[in-house]
A protein has these predicted regions:
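Short glycine-rich anion-binding loops that position phosphate/pyrophosphate groups of nucleotides
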Residues: 58-61, 130-134
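N-terminal active-site beta-alpha-beta segment that forms phosphate/nucleotide-binding
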Residues: 2-120
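Surface-exposed, charge/polar-rich loops and edge strands
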Residues: 1-9, 13-16, 20-27, 111, ...
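A short beta-strand-loop-alpha-helix capping motif that often carries His-Thr
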Residues: 88, 122-129, 142
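Charged helix-capping and loop-helix junction motifs
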Residues: 70, 139-145
Length: 192
């Protein structure tokens, strides 16, 4: 049974709290956590079959998926990262060392010179987040970019973050899209 909405935390307050907790992790600890998450991901039976990954370029204290995508690219997996165009995410081919642009708020994205990758062709989305609920609810930054994307595609939605980003449930809205799994230094959790 879901708790009454009166007992659920406010999304804005929860975003602030989870960002502060994530920011409190030292760069060395974040790096160690990412390396441990990579070990867990390598054990996932679907990992070796992934052909195209939709990833992201990390911002500030976000989980840095570069180690995950590097190991995938070494075995021939294509990596794409999003550019924001007209309030929508459009994925572009990306390799370490490619040119990037800095957007509003310091967020990095591939340049428009890189090849477009259709979102429908992506079979695994490594998804940034502030929080992940116990049932796969994703707490993002409030822009709805990933909710709009996930309403249109069928690829596996894997939230990537740190264990401290697992949160108590909050009130979700009709447009909120759930994750299929969550990866952290503690392991891989799949949601039904």
């Amino acid at each position: 049974m879901k708790p009454s909405t009166d007992a659920l935390p406010d999304k804005r307050a929860l975003r602030r709290q989870l960002r502060a907790e994530r920011d409190s992790l030292s760069p060395a600890l974040r790096h160690a956590h990412v390396q441990q998450a990579n070990v867990h991901l390598a054990r996932w039976e679907r990992w070796s079959a992934v052909k195209v990954i939709g990833s992201y370029l990390p911002h500030e204290s976000e989980f840095d998926p570069t180690a995950l995508t590097r190991s995938a690219r070494e075995r021939g997996t294509r990596i794409a990262c999003p550019r924001v165009i007209d309030k929508a995410l459009h994925f572009h081919d990306w390799q370490e060392g490619d040119a990037v642009e800095v957007t509003i708020g310091g967020v990095l994205q591939p340049t428009n010179a890189s090849e477009i990758v259709r979102a429908e062709d992506i079979d695994l989305f490594l998804t940034p987040l502030l929080g992940c609920g116990q049932d796969g609810a994703r707490l993002g930054y409030g822009g709805g970019f990933y909710d709009r994307l996930f309403a249109e595609v069928t690829g596996f939605r894997l939230g990537v973050g740190f264990a401290l980003q697992r949160a108590a449930d909050w009130e979700t809205e009709a447009h909120d899209q759930r994750l299929h799994g969550f990866l952290s230094e503690e392991g891989l959790t799949l949601f039904s």
